[in-house]
Amino acid sequence: RAQEVAASTLPEGLGTPGRRVLIKGGAVLSMDDAVGNFAVGDVLIDGKRIVEVGANIEAGDSVVIEATGKIVMPGFVDTHHHQFETALRSQLANGILINDGLPENAANYYETILQGFSQVYRPEDVYINELFGGIAQLDAGVTTVMDVSQIHHSPEHSDAAIEGLRDAGRRGVFGYFEGWGERSKYPTDAARIKQQYFSSDDQLTTMVMGGEIYVPGY
């Protein structure tokens, strides 16, 4: 059901090659000295790339987004996010990373979140967390994310994480980190995931491997 809702609310053809969008008439802050800023300017997007920034851009075949009275600027980049934990964002606010042996730190991130809450996640829970986390970040102006994904308890969990990240419609890097349990296929499932979801490096969602593969035992 969440997938159906996502498909029905995102703009048609989002990020697809050849789809042109003109953001028109906004106050453009390019953050690039070579491009400059415009009190009233336009931004032309072709597929997933910005191809022109300037005043009075002619692009008659484009979908037009009227930006008069608004600021147009590059989105923020989040370099480290665990999107599968979106619904847990208020949990363990005062916890430390790992158990240091002190009684007051018995409730720590690794044991409580990764070894506790995440173990009962179903694939549909992963998808909803990924999708909602992505949409919420878009609403806050974050248009690119490095998703440190540690929820690979089964191939179905992995698929749900990727599809939720992708379906939010923004640029994202899927970080394939660990999972636990008898059905976990980490890291050997990486070949299937790469072939099924990341056959091209020139797409909105791309893949990197997690650092655990360099730890003895993997």
Which residues are covered by each model-predicted region?
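Short coil/turn connectors at secondary-structure junctions
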Residues: 17-19, 60-62, 68, 140-143, ...
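Metal-coordinating catalytic core of metallo-dependent amide/deamination hydrolases
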Residues: 12, 151-218
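Histidine-rich, glycine-flanked metal-binding segment
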Residues: 4-21, 27-74
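Hydrophobic alpha-helical hairpins/lids featuring a short glycine-rich hinge
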Residues: 115-150
